[in-house]
Amino acid sequence: MGFSAGDSKKGANLFKTRCAQCHTLEEGGGNKIGPALHGLFGRKTGSVDGYAYTDANKQKGITWDENTLFEYLENPKKYIPGTKMAFGGLKKDKDRNDIITFMKEATA
């Protein structure tokens, strides 16, 4: 299974409770504990200016889209061994679909 469009409102709530403490979405939001996510879709891993990525993130060599995020957000440390992202992941497909749908709207 891969990504399918979800509920943006539910995704916004998930982002607020699971992601916002470490990431910003808005343009010019800047890096926090994690890199800024504005413009995420279509961007290569490990490429936000001013953020200190691990070599694992820089060398992963993928471009973020709905399907790569769907896989990554299930278990970040499995998808990119060596990432410093401490988040354990979203195990439910529906939660990942909702948050990706929201992020796609919020980071465009």
Swiss-Prot record:
Primary localisation category: mitochondrion
PTM notes: Binds 1 heme c group covalently per subunit.
SUPFAM superfamilies: Cytochrome c (SSF46626)
N-terminal signal peptide: none
Annotated binding of heme c, by residue: 19, 22-23, 85
Pfam families: Cytochrom_C
Modification sites for N6,N6,N6-trimethyllysine: 77
GO BP terms in the entry: mitochondrial electron transport, cytochrome c to oxygen; mitochondrial electron transport, ubiquinol to cytochrome c
GO cellular component: mitochondrial intermembrane space
Membrane-traversing stretches: none
Annotated compartments: Mitochondrion intermembrane space
Keyword annotations from UniProtKB, A to Z: Electron transport, Heme, Iron, Metal-binding, Methylation, Mitochondrion, Respiratory chain, Transport
GO molecular function: electron transfer activity; heme binding; metal ion binding
InterPro entries: Cyt_c-like_dom, Cyt_c-like_dom_sf, Cyt_c_1A/1B
Protein family: Belongs to the cytochrome c family.
Function summary: Electron carrier protein. The oxidized form of the cytochrome c heme group can accept an electron from the heme group of the cytochrome c1 subunit of cytochrome reductase. Cytochrome c then transfers this electron to the cytochrome oxidase complex, the final protein carrier in the mitochondrial electron-transport chain.
Protein name according to UniProt: Cytochrome c
Gene source species: Neurospora crassa (strain ATCC 24698 / 74-OR23-1A / CBS 708.71 / DSM 1257 / FGSC 987)
